[in-house]
Amino acid sequence: MELNVDSAKQLLAEHEQELQSAHDAHSILLASQPITAATTHPNATASNAARAVPVVAPSSVPTPTAASTPFISTQPPAPAQTGRMQLIDEQQKFNSADFSPHLENWGLADAGFGYDLCAVLGSQSTGKSTLLNKLFGTNFDVMSESARQQTTKGIWMCKGLKMNVLVMDVEGTDGRERGEDQDFERKSALFSMASAEVLIVNLWEHQVGLYQGANMGLLKTVFEVNLGLFQASRAKTAGAKDKTLLLFVIRDHIGVTPLENLSATIMADLTKIWHSLSKPQGLELSKITDFFDFMFTTLPHKILQPAEFDKAVDVLRNRFVNPKDPNFVFKTEYHKRIPADGLAHYLESIWEQVMTNKDLDLPTQQELLAQFRCDEIANVAFAHFATSIKDFRKHIEGGSVVESLGADMALHRSTALSKFDRDASRYHQEVYKRKRIDLLDKLNGSLSPFFLGQLKNLHRLMLQSFKQAVLDRMRTEPNYDFGEVVSSEKRTALAKFSAAAQAVLLTDTDWTIDDEVVELDVEIQSISDTMRVEETKKMVAQIERTFNKNIGEPVELALKSAKRSMWDEVLISFSTLLEQAEATYVRKATSFNCTDDENEHALLALRRKSWMSMRAKVDEQTADSVIAAKLRNSFEDGFRYDDAGVPRVWKPEDDMDGAFRKARDETLELIALYAKIQAVDTTLMRELRSKFEDAEPVGLVVEDEAFDWHATLSVLSETRKNDIGMRFRKEADAMYVEAKRATVSSIAQVPLWMYGVMLVLGWNELMAILSSPVYFAFLLVLIASAYIVWRLNLSGPLISVLRAVANEVHRLADAQLRTHFSQPLREPRPPAESRPAEQIELEPN
């Protein structure tokens, strides 16, 4: 929707040749005098060439779209969160008391030139505040839809959201509240035009071509007063005139009349007004474009076309935030060159001049010339100064500490001030002194980043040096006192930092290192605390490893023999080792300067971890396989051995069933004994309960899981107890059946006549064996072997071994047979008569 107003430029063509050379000189001068921001700002980084765009954007520039500007949000910005202030109230009183605090809250007090200022002008209830809120994310009050009445009273100011732009919302003109009293309208319009870089003129499409409706009468008065009050004294100085951009925003544009025609109408009216002005001496031939640049844009109807309105506002916002936009509005030549910290005084002085100079009493020509020349000389001196300090940035930003930085900064600053004093001291002394102070502040502002960067690098270097020195002493000193080491190295680091920081402090500055020293002290203390925590953790970990190593054997020995006092032995060993671990911690923690809370928390954590380590050993000794072996051994001791420990040989008359039941029941009782840690001595349990169950966690450390000491006393759950009992019963039943079978086989009877038959039938074989020493000896060996197998009850294992041997022999034989039969059969040789004689003779046998 942005078009070039070619027709308007044609109306002004006859005046261009007269002041073209002056305009070129003005551009060259501005290019050599860049605005240097004290803080990073998008406008400060844009080149002057990029900003030197004439009256309106070229017609060849297409309308920006959301696709061509992906960095522009398609949604309106959120309301500003930094607050607003009433700069000038309804009684025309300037609110200087609240300006500086608001500037601090907005983060612009130290912005230097890194800010921009714009204002809006227009009739009452034309949506000025709504437009500003949409464009900049401000939170100015807007008119209620239900009652068309004055909303903005006086002049309000707010900072744009996420941009260093100060926005002034000016009370609307032609309001019924003030009626014919146009005094405040003129003053507020003149104030806005004199102070703002960009003045947004908000009007409806149907107001274009009107005289009062388009505020042309007001603009005529403002142009004339502004020209006489602020510009006449600079008429003879080429390129020194301040320029302001007038951005006409034509609202409720329906598209019937092109923007080109609307802008041409407005430019024609403005040119006519300018020609009718009573110009001061020296400005009779001046053109309106010598003091103002113009841009024009349109917006659709906000109510009838809300989507198109929002999209157009987004495109318009790009002019204010994107320095690369060809229609970027905050150009260098529009900036008033007032540092942010002096903005309050500057705006107040403008308002006082507007209020009190009824007859347009101007400052003297001497003061005006002094102001201009001092600014010019200061800019030249600062340019040489900026060139001479460029090398500092590379070293400082590279993280290096420049030892001679203080002396070098003082030398370059003194050189710049000397150049300024030599050339500027001839002019008005009050202006010279004021400008010298301004230059000194500017020089100090340029050196301040190097000063802060040097402190930052020193800060980082001292932290590294402190940490490395502490670690080196901890490695080289075997019996070091951690608290003494930290205190000593801390004093050394702070002393070195203070000495190096004092070397870069310059006179005539408000620089101080007190905050940096305090910050360094805090960070060193933080590093010390971190190192102390790490060393404490290492110490506790070493104590835990020692405890784990020592607790294993006592637990294993105590649980190996199942008896009622086994848990007493385990807990006594645990308490003894825990006391040793706590004593070791307390002895070593003394040198770490740990607080009582830290010690209490560490001891509590040590107790809990030690207990869990002991529980882990208990779990190892009560695993299913281990506890099954323990139960089996206990059962065998009671069933297969008598009270004297002699193996039993069961006879038919022995009470095997009673012995089996007794051994089984006694063994099953052991499961309940292993299931829970319960000492016979209740004193032990009370002491442990006081250490674990009654203690509350201390400090800021939160454990991953809640510690439930009472729950850790349970070793075997009910499910595990049932499973272990069932498996044991099966094993015990198997042992009983085996013993019973051996007894039954021993009492089986053979008929007596069978022995006679065997003797008669086997008499010959018997005599052959008895008469042969070899057979007889072999018979004796078999009888002895059988007796041994029977006596030691090895029949079961022997059968298992024989079965395994048979299976292995079967496997090997099967493998050999498969290998043999898997080979192909050799073909038989053909008979000799079917082969040639030569082949038969040559063929080997």
Swiss-Prot record:
Residues 826-838 have a biased composition (Basic and acidic residues). The chain crosses the membrane at residues 750-770, 774-794. Residues 112-334 form the GB1/RHD3-type G domain. Residues 823-845 are annotated as: Disordered. GO terms for biological process: endoplasmic reticulum membrane fusion. It is found in: Endoplasmic reticulum membrane. SUPFAM superfamilies: P-loop containing nucleoside triphosphate hydrolases (SSF52540). Residues 771-773 are lumenal. The keyword Cell membrane does not apply. Keywords: Coiled coil, Endoplasmic reticulum, GTP-binding, Hydrolase, Membrane, Nucleotide-binding, Transmembrane, Transmembrane helix. Its EC number is 3.6.5.-. GTP binds at G122, S123, Q124, S125, T126, G127, K128, S129. Residues 1-29 form a coiled coil. Cooperates with the reticulon proteins and tubule-shaping DP1 family proteins to generate and maintain the structure of the tubular endoplasmic reticulum network. Has GTPase activity, which is required for its function in ER organization. PANTHER family: PROTEIN SEY1. This is Protein SEY1. It comes from Mycosarcoma maydis (Corn smut fungus).
